[in-house]
Amino acid sequence: MEQYRFEAEGPAGRIEAHAYDPGKRRGIALIAHPHPLFGGTMDNKIAQTLAKSFLELGYLSVRFNFRGVGTSSGTYDEGIGETEDALALLEFLKKREGNLPLALAGFSFGGFVQAKVANRIEAEKVALVAPAVGKYDVPEVKQDLLLIHGEEDEVIPLSDLFEWARPQGHAVTVLPGASHFFHGRLAQLKKIVVDSFKD
């Protein structure tokens, strides 16, 4: 395994990204971080946990900073420009790495963005951790979906996620006692992702 930082060109300019590369790849996983106006970056612990989960599954695992975060160009755009950034980065990776299967994962605001991305591309796997339903108009996700939420989430109430998931028929994996940031539960979170997506 190697890891490295790189840059891609997006609609607002530079996109700063980080990759975990397993060598032999079964696909590309793109991970989106929580809300940029509340300190969210690609180095968020849950974003890193998701990246390491997909690395273990054999994916080239890429997390990136939304516009206006770190050295990424631009300014916060309420999920609209952030979706375009994600799509531009996926296009860049497809050209560089070839037409590998795609997986999407996102936490909180990043889950909202990845739900939008999932409606624009063919993704083999989608994992949303505490997606920001109730805060944003999160679109339906047609793909098979792994939804993970903390029972004691103080930012996105579990009941809001049930309201969003119920009409779509999506199952929800609930971690009893876990908060929005899954304090002390990251190893468990990783195991759920890896076990869910193992062949």
Model-derived features: positions:
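Short beta-strand/loop motif that positions the catalytic acidic residue
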Residues: V141, L146-H149, D153
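Alpha/beta-hydrolase active-site loop
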Residues: Y76-R96
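N-terminal cap/lid segment of alpha/beta-hydrolase-fold proteins
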Residues: M1-K24
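Catalytic histidine-centered segment of alpha/beta-hydrolase-like enzymes
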Residues: G74, A178-K190
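Short, surface-exposed "cap/lid" segments of acyl-processing enzymes
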Residues: R14, G23-N65
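Acidic catalytic loop of the alpha/beta-hydrolase fold
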Residues: E151-I156, H180-F181
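Gly/Ala-rich beta-loop-alpha elbow adjacent to hydrolase catalytic centers
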Residues: A105-Q114
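Short alpha-helix in the alpha/beta-hydrolase fold that links the catalytic acid
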Residues: P157-A165, A187
